[in-house]
């Protein structure tokens, strides 16, 4: 079990000590897709609950900032940049999240959390008119680290 950084030799979980690591510029990009009927995709800005795209964008940004409260072993980070964009296509919405910081640990969980919560927000807001939606392809597409 020792190759898992969050698990001790005894099998206990822990938050990794990053105190001795130097500060680095960190960036992560994640994506998620919400598949839906074409008619649903056309109506996303005019749903009974309101504009799903604007709401999901804000929800994703808020989620990135609260990742350490949602995922127990994540470090709380001061994020310098969060961007969530939603692109509507005929078969649904592709969500991209970009997160940046200067810290001792990466921001991939923040980017993944941003797109996941944005996708769930789209789903929540459109579920009344489309019972066949699915959230798919939540993935990390880029992770970079440069000296600060």
Question: What residue spans do the PLM features occupy?
Answer:
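C-terminal binding/interaction regions
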Residues: 1-75, 79-148
């Amino acid at each position: 079990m020792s190759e898992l950084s969050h698990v001790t030799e005894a099998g206990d979980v822990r938050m990794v000590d990053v105190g001795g690591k130097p500060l680095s510029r960190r960036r992560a990009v994640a994506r998620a897709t919400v598949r839906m009927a074409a008619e649903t995709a056309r109506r996303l800005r005019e749903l009974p609950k309101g504009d799903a795209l604007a709401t999901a964008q804000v929800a994703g940004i808020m989620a990135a900032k609260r990742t350490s409260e949602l995922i127990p072993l994540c470090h709380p980070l001061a994020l310098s940049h969060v961007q969530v964009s939603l692109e509507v296509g005929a078969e649904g919405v592709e969500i991209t999240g970009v997160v940046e910081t200067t810290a001792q640990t990466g921001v991939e969980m923040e980017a993944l959390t941003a797109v996941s919560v944005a996708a769930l927000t789209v789903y929540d807001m459109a579920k009344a008119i489309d019972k066949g939606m699915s959230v798919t392809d939540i993935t990390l597409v880029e992770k970079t680290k440069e000296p600060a």
